Amino acid sequence: MKNKKLHIWIALVVIAFFVCLAIFGCGDSIKGIRDMRFGIDIRGGVEAVFEPAGLKTKPTKEQLEMARDVIETRLDAQNILDREVTVDEKAGDIIVRFPWKSDEKDFDPETAIQELGEMAELTFRGEDNTVYVKGSDVSKSQVAVDQQNRYVVELEFTSKGAKKFADATEKLVGQTMRIYMDEELISNPTVNAKITGGKAEITGMASQEEAQNLSDKINSGALPFSMETTNYNTISPTLGNKALNAMALAAEIALVLTCLFMIAWYRLPGVISCLTLAFQVALQVLVISVPQYTITLPGIAGLILSAGMAVDANIIISERISEELKKGNSVRTAVKNGYKRAFSSVLDGNVTTAVVAGILMVLGSGTMLSFGYTLLTGVIINLLAGVWMSRYMLNSVIRYKLFNQEKWFRKKKEKKILKFTETKKYFFLTSVVLLMAGLIWSSVNGMKLDTQFTGGVILRYTYSGEADTGKIQKEVQDVVDRNVNVQTAKNSATGEKNLVITLSGKKGLTPEQQKEILNTINEGNTNQFETAETSAIEPYIGAKALKNSAIAIVLSFLFIVVYIRVRFSALGGLASGVTAVIALLHDILIVLFIFGIFKIPVNDAFVAVTLTIIGYSINDTIVLYDRIREHRNGAKNKSTLAELVDISTTETLQRSINTAFTVVLCAFVIFVVSVVYGMESITNFSLPLLAGLISGCYSSICIAGPLWVWWEEHKERIQKRKTGRKGK
């Protein structure tokens, strides 16, 4: 027993070790927070979906893998080593993500995308267009300078290639040998004699850069087919760095405020909760940084929110300990029983949230995949490490006489049982009024799907001085032959000016068109426009994203109904599952109407918010159901269903409010910081999330329980009628 006093010191050493490891890392194998791999929305970069061009049939797996290898080699040649190249075998696409070369001011992301998709097949042809030698016959290519001090590309052929080249030059003596890159003629020298030795050179290079690009293409090899993209996103590193600084600030503020609240309210258990939270955050950082998982802005938001939700487990435990102390138990007994009786609620809540996050990972992509990953790892770490560590430390601390006193704990006071079920009609009416108001307001404003789901193009540029939107609109329309909307915006916090160009229709945009637009609006303007962000998406990509989003939400609902039916069979199973889902639908509609009221286009942020609210709200409802089940299974319990719900809701009310406060606090900090820093994407994510969290707390307290009572009482009345008929 005395040895347990040492556990707190062991735990503190372990926590300090992992916190230091998370901050500083250890060598090349364990990277810390400073070496985390950030997504293109943070550090700037390019994301493009390449699809085969001109193929009559779907490319095979082997062809796609071959194309990926070529793209990887081309990225190597450009020294872009930190990238992701993913094959979507089902869709027949290749998805490429790589960072913006922030150290190169002249880096052109559109040109980079265009070059990646070029087939780049080198061919040596005769005057009749007969192909004699191909790029695959070349073993090596390099840039050199000839005797006239001109840049050339030297070629070395394979053994088979050398023979083919010798045979071709022998046949074409006195004629020109035309050298093509794809269908572009790059050189047409006259063959004077048969060339042996397996070497040749390509002349006519205008510069070293042109020669190097040609050499890189030859060395990389040709794609098995040409690829094109009208689906891509780019973001400048300047915009990304501002977003990273803002989210880091939000994380610091949210964690500090959460810890201050926990210590002020729960005292000693609150201190233990903060230490546990530091341990969990350190583990989560390592889970992201060690495997170099790409973290995006929504991923950081998920990290902050998972930290806020992790506090929930400690709140449940602390509230249980307070109840045990109120019963007259000793501190040690209260702590022991508190953890024991809180475990089922913690387990059920974490399982449902983990499954929802897993669904988002499976069906989501890009930034939302990152959000799902951080949320899922946060939940798993909370369940496996967080709860255990807090119990380990608290059980050790109370072995010291100084802390084995009730003054270090918050003791619950007797509370009057609140009659939630008697006022259920008012709760239901309030919800109906809110939902109807939201429906009407959203209908007036009009719900709008983002280009992410519908397809389309949005171009964002930064500039200084003044911008003639009318002139720019006409210039861009002449380039793309589509209706164009041009708007200007100014970030009140930074003073940065933005030009936003939206192209009508649901077509994407080629990199060549994007370059032409930028050149056109810069031509003749004293104010130079610089690309900040581009988004070009084809309708079929958007339709796929919308379909996956709908599937994710439906699967989440189905899982919740099945899980609650199994876990809470004592509460009618199906009744508890269906009423929980109705409460969730209430919250989702609130979120949807927030999108409509504030004219926020519905995109994957809506999906992430919805799934987060599902995980949070169902967790709240499960805590209530768990308490109802506990009372209903009591041997001496003779309370009515309404009394059971009123007692259980009153007992869990403080926990619900405190959990809502900590999570809403985190979301509110994210919202405020995003508004101050002008991060529209995060604002459009955090505002609906904030509303959904508040709605989730309300629905779990005022809707789920009373609705379950109404269902069960209605079922009993039907059963009595049937029994009465049989008696007659």
Outline where the language-model segments fall:
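A structural signal for conserved, well-ordered secondary-structure elements
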Residues: M1-K728
